[in-house]
Amino acid sequence: MGALLWSLLLLLQEAKGFSGDDEDPEEVIGVLQESINLSLEIPSNEEIKHIDWLFQNNIAIVKPGKKGQPAVIMAVDPRYRGRVSISESSYSLHISNLTWEDSGLYNAQVNLKTSESHITKSYHLRVYRRLSKPHITVNSNISEEGVCNISLTCSIERAGMDVTYIWLSSQDSTNTSHEGSVLSTSWRPGDKAPSYTCRVSNPVSNISSRRISVGSFCADPGYPEKPSMLCLLVKSLFLLLLLAILTVGLCLFRAQKSYETPRVRKLKRNRIKLRKKGKSGPTPV
């Protein structure tokens, strides 16, 4: 009986068609595995026979209850069983645990008791995933002219549709931006190193990466870096200090050598005298 009722109602909807097909559907944004509400406003002076919620086929057929009684859901598409509910006051459709397959065009057809006409409202549902934190990959090379060319690639896992990439740079106290997942830039070591942040967004989320400074990616030991005045001053002071230490050490070494030489000679002479005395032996009595 239930299957027969479902088939008859479906044929009836196809035969009637929809009024208001020329109206633009209401855009509705949903989040994957979360819930969405398709609101429905019905004039208070209209008596309702039944309401049909459709997506590809019928999702649910709702018959208002008598005074003080809840509405009766006469049929539910098996794909939505356990995931849909109807508002008692407005007959709006609530869908939980959204999937990618739920995206598309929905129609609410309100069939009136007073006439054969009906009120129709359309919705275009788009389902998106909340974005994860983006990751930046850096590739760099040094040209013959001494310029570091850098390519930054911003990526996220399971991005989905309608994702926007924006690069933000704070340099010289000004904020600049660049659109696209790949940013190409150049930098000469010795200049102030720029830093970048990738911001990704879709209709349901907005998240930024950690800030990346490109200075560390061009730190090549063989690169002809432009030394700063402070660096030159520190190096000069270090060399002067080293030279002073070497000079003092050499002077001390020479002074010690000149002081110890006569003493060593005297010791040698004393040793020779002792040896001669030992060879001559004791004096006879």
Curated annotation (Swiss-Prot):
Ig-like V-type domain span: 25-126
Cytoplasmic side: 254-285
Topological domains, Extracellular: 18-232
Localization per Swiss-Prot or TrEMBL: Membrane
Transmembrane segments annotated in the record for this chain: 233-253
Cross-referenced Gene3D superfamilies: Immunoglobulins
Keyword Membrane: yes
A GO biological-process term: plasmacytoid dendritic cell differentiation
Carbohydrate attachment residues: N37, N97, N141, N149, N175, N206
Pfam families: V-set
Main localization of the protein described in the UniProt heading: membrane
Keywords linked to the UniProt accession: Disulfide bond, Glycoprotein, Immunoglobulin domain, Membrane, Signal, Transmembrane, Transmembrane helix
Signal peptide as annotated in the record: 1-17
Domain Ig-like C2-type: 134-213
Disulfide partners: C154-C198
Gene Ontology CC terms, in alphabetical order: cell surface; membrane
Membrane topology: Single-pass type I membrane protein
UniProt-listed PANTHER family: SIGNALING LYMPHOCYTIC ACTIVATION MOLECULE, SLAM FAMILY MEMBER 9
Role played: May play a role in the immune response.
UniProt protein name: SLAM family member 9
Gene it is expressed from: Slamf9
